Each structure stands twice: as C-alpha cells, then as structure tokens.
C-alpha cells in the first residue's frame, strides 16, 4: 500500500472513521483469531453536531501531514445531505478531491454471496459488516449484531463444499430508540439513556423492583431475547461441534453485553473492518 487509506462509516447518528497508514503490516488471518483492528488511528463524531465535520477535517489534515493523498472508502446510510457534507469535509481536509469509493451493496464479494431477494436493497452497512466479519472468520457461521440507532442481526452461513452466503436477518429498534419511545409516548415513565440501561444489566437482578430499572431491564430483555433466539436457531440447524459465533458491534454493544446469555465477541466497528477488506481486495 503506497498511500494511506481512510475508512468512513456514516451511520444514522454518528460518523466513525479509521486511518490506515501506508505500509503498515497487516494482521495474519488464521480463521480462528479474534477480529483485528487493522488501522492506526480511529475516531467518531456525531455528524449533525455543529462544527463536528470541521473538527474531523482538521484531524484528518494533521494525519496526512502533507503526505500522499489517501484513498477513501465510505459506507453511508444517512442519506445524500450528509454525503455532500462529508465530501466537503474531505475537500477541506486534503485540499482537493481524494479518490472516494462510495460502497454499495452487491450480489457478491469474493466468496460471500448476498442472499437478499434484491441484493442492492440490503443496507450497505449490513452488507459491509458481514463482508468484514467473514473476511477474518471464513469458516464460521456468524450472527453479526450491530447495536446502533437500529439493532440489526445478520446471518452468514458457510457451505461444506465452500463459499458463504449472507442469508438475511432481523431489524429492530435500537436500545436508545426503545428507551426514548417509552419516555416520549407515555405520561409518567422516565427517560433513560443507554448507559443507565447498561448499569442495570450489570446488576444481574432477575426482576426490577422500581420503574427506572424495569424499563431498562425490559428493553434489554427484548434486545437480548432476539439475539439469543436467533443464535439458538442457527445452532439447531448447524454443526453442534462448531456453534455459530455471535459478533457484537455498534455504540450500544457495551450495554447489551451485560444482558446476553450466549457466548459473544465484541468488535469496535465491523463496518470499518469490512471497508478495510474491500479496500485490500481492490488493491
């Protein structure tokens, strides 16, 4: 890699980014290791916050430090307005137009086939996250959970004869959205944030004895129940000696982690990992 790479995951609320230095060594792929973070710098901003993209541009400018123009790989689910704002921030950061790949969902990537009825209608973040997970865990059935504004559960299966398939999945309101909806649409229920809900999960009480904790426990149980039910269904149809691997990512992953009763592994951002895999395949 003769030039750095900038990976950008534009979600509904936050923009997450990672910077891969030119010439940085890649982690080895064993198919059994924990998922890597093959970048040297990373960060996140609330993209609608005043001045957030200007601050990001300044940080990226400092990382480039007059060196080669980076190639940029972007996954965007926030729509065209934020896309234009990010384009402007990149021009501000680099003093010109860096080569940008706006990733779209496709029928396949490598040996991973997109099993969606209309492959291009699959949310690009879900597709890219699955690509990233499968790139590093190519022999495993995967339940990819991304806990963001929405919580998505995506399934990747591996055929005995080779090849893999994105089977589809589930979408449910994210933890913050569940908590906020209760507060906004009821007269007397209090507002909770994700951190407060996570502390209730950590308390390990079976039943809540107050309204605050009952809301947190109920929303966490809904999220965890969907994950656990899907994980068990995958296990029932697969190889008992090689259970599915549940991968937990997204901003609310820490809160959900305390509520789950199935084995899981956490990664900071599977979408960035997928963008990295796509960029390397294109090199």
UniProtKB/Swiss-Prot annotation:
InterPro entries hit by this protein: ATPase_NBD (IPR043129), Type_III_PanK (IPR004619)
Catalytic activity as recorded in UniProt: (R)-pantothenate + ATP = (R)-4'-phosphopantothenate + ADP + H(+)
* Binding positions (ATP): 9-16, 149
PANTHER family reported for this sequence: TYPE III PANTOTHENATE KINASE (PTHR34265:SF1)
Q: What is said about its interaction partners and assembly?
A: Homodimer.
Belongs to which family? Answer: Belongs to the type III pantothenate kinase family.
GO (cellular component) term, any one: cytoplasm
Q: Name one GO biological process term.
A: coenzyme A biosynthetic process
Cite the entry's keywords alphabetically.
ATP-binding, Coenzyme A biosynthesis, Cytoplasm, Kinase, Nucleotide-binding, Potassium, Transferase
Please give the Gene Ontology molecular function terms for this protein. ATP binding; pantothenate kinase activity
Give the matching Pfam families: Pan_kinase (PF03309)
The residues that the entry says bind substrate are 116, 123-126, 211
Provide the species name.
Cupriavidus taiwanensis (strain DSM 17343 / BCRC 17206 / CCUG 44338 / CIP 107171 / LMG 19424 / R1)
Record keywords: Cytoplasm included? yes
User: What metabolic or biological pathway is this protein involved in?
Assistant: Cofactor biosynthesis; coenzyme A biosynthesis; CoA from (R)-pantothenate: step 1/5
Catalytic residues in the record: 125
Its function, per the record, reads:
Catalyzes the phosphorylation of pantothenate (Pan), the first step in CoA biosynthesis.
Q: Which cofactor does it need?
A: NH4(+); K(+)
This chain belongs to which protein, by name?
Answer: Type III pantothenate kinase
Give the gene symbol: coaX
Instruction: Give EC number(s), comma-separated.
Output: 2.7.1.33
Note on cofactor: A monovalent cation. Ammonium or potassium.
Location of this chain's protein in the cell: Cytoplasm
């Amino acid at each position: 890699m003769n030039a750095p790479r900038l990976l950008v995951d534009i979600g509904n609320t936050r923009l997450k980014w990672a910077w891969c230095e030119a010439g940085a060594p890649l982690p080895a792929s064993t198919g059994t290791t924990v998922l890597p973070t093959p970048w040297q710098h990373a960060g996140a901003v609330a993209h609608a916050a005043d001045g957030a993209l200007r601050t990001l541009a300044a940080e990226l400018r400092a990382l480039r430090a007059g060196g080669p123009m980076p190639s940029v790989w972007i996954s965007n689910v926030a729509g065209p307005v934020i896309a234009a704002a990010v384009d402007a921030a990149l021009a501000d950061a680099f003093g010109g137009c860096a080569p940008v790949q706006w990733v779209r969902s496709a029928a396949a990537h490598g040996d991973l086939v997109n099993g969606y009825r209309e492959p291009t209608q699959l949310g690009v973040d879900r597709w890219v996250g699955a690509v990233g997970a499968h790139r590093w865990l190519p022999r495993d059935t995967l339940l990819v959970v991304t806990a963001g504004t929405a919580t998505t559960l995506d399934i990747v299966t591996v055929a005995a004869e080779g090849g893999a398939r994105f089977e589809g999945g589930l979408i449910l309101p994210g933890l913050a959205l569940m908590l906020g909806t209760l507060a906004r649409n009821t007269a007397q229920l209090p507002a909770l944030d994700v951190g407060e809900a996570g502390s209730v999960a950590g308390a390990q009480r079976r039943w809540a004895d107050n309204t605050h904790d009952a809301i947190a426990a109920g929303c966490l149980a809904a999220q965890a129940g969907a994950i656990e039910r899907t994980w068990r269904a995958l296990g029932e149809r697969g190889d008992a000696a090689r259970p599915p691997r549940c991968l937990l990512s997204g901003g609310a992953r820490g809160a959900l982690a305390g509520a789950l009763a199935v084995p899981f592994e956490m990664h900071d951002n599977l979408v960035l990992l997928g963008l990295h895999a796509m960029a390397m395949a294109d090199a």
